[in-house]
Amino acid sequence: MADLSTLMPALVLGVCALAGYLLGSVPFGLVLVRLAGLGDVRGIGSGNIGATNVLRTGRKDLALATLVLDSGKGAIAALVASALASRIAGFEDAVLAGLLAGGMAVVGHNFPIWLGFKGGKGVATTLGTLLATAWPVGLAACATWLVVAALFRYSSLAALVCLALAPAYALVLATPAHAAVFALLALLAWIRHRANIARLLKGEESRIGAKKKAAP
């Protein structure tokens, strides 16, 4: 029979994964829009609960708050998990705990238990995880988003490109373990952006700052 010291790393990782998922499941965009008296954000624009769709309410402050809070879900989950695990399971397990908790926060954001597993696309939460677990990679990804967004004016394209490059950045700036986790998160983001990809290919995706044409 395995002793407690043998089981402890697995137990710690399990708790970190669950806590990360539950934190990620908190739908800050939905909560903020409702508190502002603007109804259900899922009935606006794309129906997404993230910052981009919150911006369609016309409230930049709510969109910014959503962006910060959604990013914070990944960052806080990763940092807290890593700090706690480092005291129990050792440094290597602490790194894995941070990656796992941050990754599960992204899963929670995309498939929140509180909303019937229908959530967002996880870009902000993923970037928060990158910044918390390997900040040089996170900064490189954020810089990539800014460059692509400035050049092409597509938020979705900027997100897809920056997350696709994150694993490559991690191989240079972090570790293969970081690269593997970031690759999985990038794949999840691409899957969640299927409709955006289709619109990009058709030239129908909305550009950043574009005004909708008034109905005749």
Swiss-Prot record:
GO molecular function: acyl-phosphate glycerol-3-phosphate acyltransferase activity
Assembly: Probably interacts with PlsX.
EC number of the protein: 2.3.1.275
Enzyme superclass (EC): transferase
Alphabetized HAMAP family for the sequence: PlsY
Provenance organism: Rhodospirillum rubrum (strain ATCC 11170 / ATH 1.1.1 / DSM 467 / LMG 4362 / NCIMB 8255 / S1)
Places the protein is found: Cell inner membrane
BP-aspect Gene Ontology terms: phospholipid biosynthetic process
Top-rank lineage group of the source organism: Bacteria
The protein, known as: Glycerol-3-phosphate acyltransferase
InterPro entries the record matches: G3P_acylTferase_PlsY
Positions of transmembrane segments: 11-31, 62-82, 95-115, 132-152, 171-191
Family to which the UniProt record says this protein belongs: Belongs to the PlsY family.
Keywords: Cell inner membrane, Cell membrane, Lipid biosynthesis, Lipid metabolism, Membrane, Phospholipid biosynthesis, Phospholipid metabolism, Transferase, Transmembrane, Transmembrane helix
Catalytic activity: an acyl phosphate + sn-glycerol 3-phosphate = a 1-acyl-sn-glycero-3-phosphate + phosphate
